[in-house]
Amino acid sequence: HWNQNTVAIRVEVECKARSEERAQENLDRIQIETKKIGGIVSAVTTIKKEMNSNSNNESMTINYYIQMPPKLAADLNQKYGNINLPSDNNGNMDIHVKYGNLNAGNFTANAMIEAKYGNIEVGNLQDAQLDLGYVGTAKIRNAKDLTIDSKYSNLDIQDIQSLRMEIKYGNLTIESVSRLDMEIKYSDAKIGTLKDALNVSSLSYSNLKIRNLSPSFSKVNVESHYGNLEVALPAKTSFRIVAENMKYSSCDVNGFN
C-alpha cells in the first residue's frame, strides 16, 4: 500500500540479443518520457523502428512499476503486454490493453475497460463500461452497473445487479443477475438465477438458458429470430406466457398441470 501523497514510477528495461553490442543498440532505440503537467503525471514509451534488421533470437521487456495514492484517477494504455493492478482501486480508471492481459482487484469508482486479444480478470465493479474483442476469457466477480459490448469473446460473471449488453460470436455465463437488457447474436448465454427482469431485443441464431427464475421476477421479454430460449419457471408462482408471430418455431411448457 502506498500512503504517500506522491507518485513514483520505476521502469525496468531488459534487452536480449546475440551480442552485447546488439543488445545496446536495441536499448538505445527505447525512449521513456516522464513528465508532470499540472495535476497530471504521465509516462510514455516510444520504440524507434529499425530498418533492414534481422531480429532473430532477440527480445525486449519493459516493465512499469507505479506507486500512487489509491484515489488518483489513472489512464493506462498497454499494447503487447500485461497490466496488473492492486486489490483495491479507488480512483476513476480508463484502461486500454491490446495483445495482453488485465488482472485487477476491486474498482470502487467508474471504470472504462477496453480489452482486445487477451484475457481479463477483475474483482468487484461499481459503474463500468467494457469493450471486449477477441478476449479468450473475461472474469468478473461482482458488479453493480455494467455496460458491455462484446465480440468474439467469452465472459463469466458471478453476480450483477444491472447489465446492458450486446454480444456477438461469443459465450456468456452469469451466476446471478437482477436486471438484464441484452442483444444476443450468434452466441450462447447461460444465466443461473434471474431475480427481476430480462429484456432481449434480439436473440438471433443464439441460445439462451435460464436455470432458475426467481418467484418474484417481474418480466421476461425476448424477441427471437432463429434462436432458442429455455427458462426454468418457478413452481409456486403465477405467470402468463405470450408467444406472438411465431414462424418456424415451437413453444413447449412442461411440468405444469
Pin down the residues of each PLM region:
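Eukaryotic tandem repeat interaction scaffolds
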Residues: S153-E230
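Acidic (Asp/Glu) and glycine-rich low-complexity loops/linkers
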Residues: H1-Q78, N84-V97, N101-A115, N119-G133, ...
